[in-house]
Amino acid sequence: SIVTSATSEMAEGMAKWALANWQVHTKEDLDDYTYYVAGLVGVMLSELWEWSAGTKTDRELAIGYGRGLQAVNILRNEQEDLDERGVSFVPDGWTRTELFAYAEENLAKADLYMKDLDKRSIKLFCKLPLALAHKTLQAMREGRDKMSRAEVEATVEEVQAD
């Protein structure tokens, strides 16, 4: 099945990263890690959309959708991951500037991915996490850790109104 196939590949990839002690050293490592932890979710969703609604999407954009969301999480949790888990998902030599650029590049792919979604329920399902990711990135650019509760609530209302 679609879900079994995606979760099997994800489990294999995560096992590989666990054996590597979650050490991300290069952009290629980051791409590989984010593919297994989030890009595959985008691929799985795309396969489900095609199966259930006949909606076809671009695989690379689906991966970008997942990667973009994960890159925002990496940025948001960077210090906590380091302090509490002793792990950094940031490639060697990268500053937050490069990590922001990585997130923005993948969120741009996610925005393009959204254009392939033609069924309202599917669009809503994907649009809210993406809108929250964009606004969280903006909040972090402004020096805040996260969005306020009021901003989250307003974003939910905005997405539902579309």
Locate predicted features.
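Catalytic cores of Mg2+-dependent Asp-rich isoprenoid enzymes
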Residues: 1-69, 75-162
